[in-house]
């Protein structure tokens, strides 16, 4: 199984995985509006892989099979001040 990964033109660190290059027919229109013009990031073989860097491999495969796409959102921002205060015991 291969997938094609696109980077969002509107949202930093947001990626859309689809089954075929330039085929967004199964992606909801509202999602595409918010995503912006997709920018090709890479073609990626999923078979034989044990993991992906920033996404759960099984969730990606299931989403591609069931709904035709997988949306990878950026991780939540770190609250360094909160971490520092908790480390200092001042929370």
Swiss-Prot record:
InterPro entries per the UniProt record, alphabetical: YcgL-like_sf (IPR038068), YcgL_dom (IPR027354)
Domain YcgL: 1-85
Chain coiled-coil ranges: none
HAMAP family referenced in this protein's UniProt entry, alphabetically: UPF0745
Name of this chain's protein: YcgL domain-containing protein Ent638_2370
Species in which this protein is naturally found: Enterobacter sp. (strain 638)
